[in-house]
Amino acid sequence: VRGFHIFGFQSFILTKKEVEDFYEIYKGIPNQDYHGLVRQGSSGRCLVLALSQGSGLKLTEEIPSVVEAFRKLCGPSDPEVCRVLYPDSLRAKYGGMNQEENAVHCSDLEEDGILEVEYFFTLLQPYQSV
């Protein structure tokens, strides 16, 4: 993706427990189908990217971080909303019919991004041979 530097890329087939651990923070949050997220996340192969700012990514007051820039590229979590309001977003192009099948997970906060990279590339990667 233009403007981002990919410093980590790995294919995973996650167990239900690994997905439950990853999405633990969403458990009990209104408008989040935790069980749907777990079901979708453990349904097959997923590709995990770790991104940083590349030379083509210009941060501004409106988009102050790599996380915000990637969230904008992904679009809102509902692919149907994306198709109407953000037709060029990743979720509009590749998402399914609901929030669980929205094609892309992206961190909510800069701090979450760091923890999520550590989860996949430090905790899980040594145990994955996919």
Predicted regions and their residues:
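Non-catalytic terminal and connector segments of soluble metabolic enzymes
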Residues: 1-130
